[in-house]
Amino acid sequence: MVWPLYRTKIEGALLRKGAKQGGTAEVTAFRLWNCRGGGPFVFLPERMFQMKNVQKYARNYFAPPAQQYHWSQREYIAQAPRWCSVDLRDGNQALVVPMDLEKKRGFFQFLCRLGFREIEVGFPAASDTEYQFVRTLIEHNLIPDDVTIQVITPAREAIIRRTVEALAGCKKAIVHLYNPTSAAQREQVFHKSRGQIIDIALQGVRTIADCVGRMKGQIQLEYTPESFTGTEPDFALAICDAVVQEWKPTAELPVILNLASTMSLSLPHIYANQIEYIDTHLRDRDKVILSLHPHNDRGSAIAEAELGMLAGGQRVEGTLFGNGERTGNVDLITLALNLYSHGVDPGLDLSNLPQVAQMYEESTGMSVSPRHPYGGQLVFAAFSGSHQDAIAKGLTWRTQHPNAHWNVPYLPLDPEDVGRSYEDDVIRINSQSGKGGIGYLMEHRYGINMPKEMREEFGYIVKGISDHQNRELSSDEVHQIFTDTYVNLSAPIQLDDFYFMHKKVYHTTVSLTVNGEQFELTGRGNGRFDAVSNALRKGLNIRFHDIVYQEHSLERGSTSRAIAYVGITADSGETFWGSGVHTDIASASIYALFSAVNRLLSF
């Protein structure tokens, strides 16, 4: 809308029929006057200024006590966290059709290949499929030695025992215990006091300890005070300390405290303050791994995770492309590549991101948005002419400075590092494109390096076709437009043959066909090209001057082709361009001249 750009005055409101003058009424429309023009400017839609019922909402988070929080003084994240994929549980439970056993198995192996070393594989007590999946991984020896599986359970004795039972024979695993702690759930769902909620958590810890005491494998405890962000900080600290004291971890095998933004409630910096408060007040901090588990309800899961890492978070749970309940979990791919783009190795192999997206879509039935950070089909695409020109010049600069840090305009990282290409994924051609992007595409994909003026003309031709057809053009279509417009044109004049003699100057005889009639022209000049040019001028009375010529090889090798570009200026002052392609560079220049002349005659 353009109206906010002007100073306006409101004359009045049209009141809903039946409303009293001076009383309360819904605004149907405002008439505004443009103070520059003085006339009625725009009518505004009904109820534009306020949503109903805003008064029933309030801030439902609990900020920690005021203190000096140091995370805000840290400029960047210096190393990658421990990653834990929860795709097979948190992500899978949010799917319309959850993955079957075979899909889960394939997805687990795929996560291992990407480099995940902690993977939550399910809720074994929730269903037979979940239980059998865990057993399949263990019994078929599908868990790599450097990978730890994680299973989740609420703090209920029967469910805990069934969960731990599923781990029989596992070399190492994480048992993830949770119970809700937020003020809302204590009051509305469980009707329990703080002390009773702590007792539930501790009883769960004791049950796990009892079960794993008879197991041979190594079991690490993870505890989540579910809805941490809606829990009073002092109570969150108290229940975390109580769990740590009950479990008695060591520095060698610490307990994982997973501080989940189960539902995002605040600005990201509040979550960071909550994390740092726990980080700096825990009793046995050296025996604890602080884990983050942000959700994306407010669209800020990435920011929460990154600020949470600055605030002391050492581990992050999330999913590929942010799959999960409601608006999803934090996207581990975006987090990892944010680190990568700052020169920090994320420890995950995302070098073929299109394949990762394909596997994700096939396994989950979900789709990756074309604008999803890093993984979307269009995230590196530039349609705008000015953007394409800047990218093309930036990429050219990099070829001249190959050891410089990546700093190409509009590209946060090198698309080739994640399995994308400049020609197919970056420079995209439509009616908004410019000569820079089109020229870059032609040069780097097809080896065609047009003169600057020709490149500008060709850019307008391509944009016009895209605009007329109202669609994007593929690179092959752009190349075909170039060929059809410029290369070896044979109408209205068809070049049949030519030969030369050299006696101080070059003499040429040119055989050609014009509208079905054959001609033979002769001419002479200082060079072959000059001789043919003079033959055309004299023999067909074609007037042109100010010839521009450029040529280069299209390929390498003894049988490579050359391409030539010729521009001629008519008496009208307009320049006409043509191109010739041939294995002989001299012949290519002659064909280019004929192409330019044919375009002049067809104008």
Predicted regions and their residues:
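Hydrophobic faces of well-ordered beta-strands that scaffold small-molecule active sites
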Residues: 83-86, 119-121, 145-153, 173-177, ...
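Alpha/beta enzyme core
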Residues: 101-114, 157-186, 190-222, 226-285, ...
